[in-house]
Amino acid sequence: MRAFIAIDVNESVRDSLVRAQDYIGSKEAKIKFVERENLHITLKFLGEITEEQAEEIKNILKKIAEKYKKHEVKVKGIGVFPNPNYIRVIWAGIENDEIIREMAREIEDELAKLGFKKEGNFVAHITLGRVKFVKDKLGLTMKLKELANEDFGSFVVDAIELKKSTLTPKGPIYETLARFELSE
């Protein structure tokens, strides 16, 4: 199964992010926007894993989740990967993300012991859309600039989740396989 580790966001943040997606629109670029219910912070993309690996990963996530307290983060600003001259991914940023970064680093280290490839430079973000091609670079850049410091609200990081991703012609369908609550 195709899987990843994520943090879900609350409904009000989802509403704000969907408004941003609508504002960005599709006039200046062909963008595959992430569905409302699929908006999340990816801590680690795993790719194809077996049932056995899923069980090992669950054990690791349970231990890690117990070490961290529930905390609030702010979703603010719009950024792009890899850079403004070549926009492939549009994302919303996370402020005060130190704890998320720490969790991601620990997940990375623990999963490396199971043979998962280490990725460097974790940036906590919520992917809003993937750019297929740009029709009007200046227009798109201007829209993104207007949202550069936009406040999309706050939410409480209260759990980490192991999610399954099933690819369909209409886009991926995510299913939560296991949810691990952070400590109070």
From Swiss-Prot:
A motif (HXTX 1) lies at residues 40-43. Gene3D superfamilies: Cyclic phosphodiesterase. A motif (HXTX 2) lies at residues 125-128. The keyword Hydrolase applies. It catalyses: a 3'-end 2',3'-cyclophospho-ribonucleotide-RNA + H2O = a 3'-end 2'-phospho-ribonucleotide-RNA + H(+). The active site is at residues 40, 125. The keyword Transit peptide does not apply. Keywords: Hydrolase. Hydrolyzes RNA 2',3'-cyclic phosphodiester to an RNA 2'-phosphomonoester. HAMAP family: RNA_CPDase. This is RNA 2',3'-cyclic phosphodiesterase.
